[in-house]
Each structure stands twice: as C-alpha cells, then as structure tokens.
C-alpha cells in the first residue's frame, strides 16, 4: 500500500516522516542534510510506494508566507520536477518545531538533538494533514 511522506524543509536539514499503510499514524523517519534531500527521496521512492508528499509550509500569524517560505518554494519546484507524478500538498507548519521539542522533552530525551526535532516536526505536519482528512 502506498504511504504518505511528510517533509519539514529547512536550510540545513530536512525532517522526513512516513504514514502507516492505512494512513492513520505518522512516524518520524529520518533527518537528511538539505543538499541530499532529493536524492534521498529518489532512493526512498524506488523502494517504497509513495502516494503523496505533505510539505510543511511556513506562514506567519497573519497567514502570509514567512521569510523561510522562499526556501520551501525553491524546494517545491525541485520536488515537482523530480517527482512529476507524485502529488504535493502544503500543510501549515506553525508551531511544529515547538510542539516537536516539547514532545521530545515529554518522552524523556535529555539532550536536545536538532535532527530529532526536525523529523518529529515532519511527523506532526503529516499527522495534522491526515487528521484533517479523516
């Protein structure tokens, strides 16, 4: 069964999450250096069926794209070029890093790992999308 991939794009690192086959739960998968993300996704999709990419989109409280959106826009063009047959949807990523950080603290993580925050953020983005589509 095809799965959904959640993506939290950043200038240095990209968090990636995956849905379960029934698209009920999102799980953190990997944190990838930004320069390697398209190749990582090509490798992943060659071994796993992906139905859709759910990409976190940075917006301000006034619902306008944040400064970071320009980087996500460039990535979106690369993603659509590399995977023309895989749909891409955008999901509001406001507060996902804060929620991911709190989630890791609550789970007992002592030393904060930024890579862990990124992939947990990707899972939160993906879970939010799936919950909204139920």
Please name every model-derived segment.
Residues 2-4, 11-12, 17-134:
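Phosphate- and other anionic-substrate recognition elements at nucleic-acid/protein interfaces
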């Amino acid at each position: 069964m095809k799965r959904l991939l959640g993506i939290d794009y950043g200038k240095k690192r990209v968090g990636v999450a995956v849905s379960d086959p029934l698209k009920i739960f999102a799980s953190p998968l990997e944190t990838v250096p930004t320069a390697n993300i398209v190749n990582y996704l090509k490798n992943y999709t060659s071994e796993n069926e992906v139905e859709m990419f759910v990409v976190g989109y940075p917006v301000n409280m006034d619902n306008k794209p944040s400064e970071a959106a320009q980087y996500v826009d460039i990535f979106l063009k690369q993603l659509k070029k590399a995977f023309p047959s895989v749909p891409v949807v955008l999901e509001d990523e406001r507060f996902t890093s804060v929620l991911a950080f709190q989630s890791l603290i609550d789970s007992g993580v002592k030393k904060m790992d930024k890579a862990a925050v990124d992939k947990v953020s990707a899972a939160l983005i993906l879970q939010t999308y799936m919950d909204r589509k139920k």
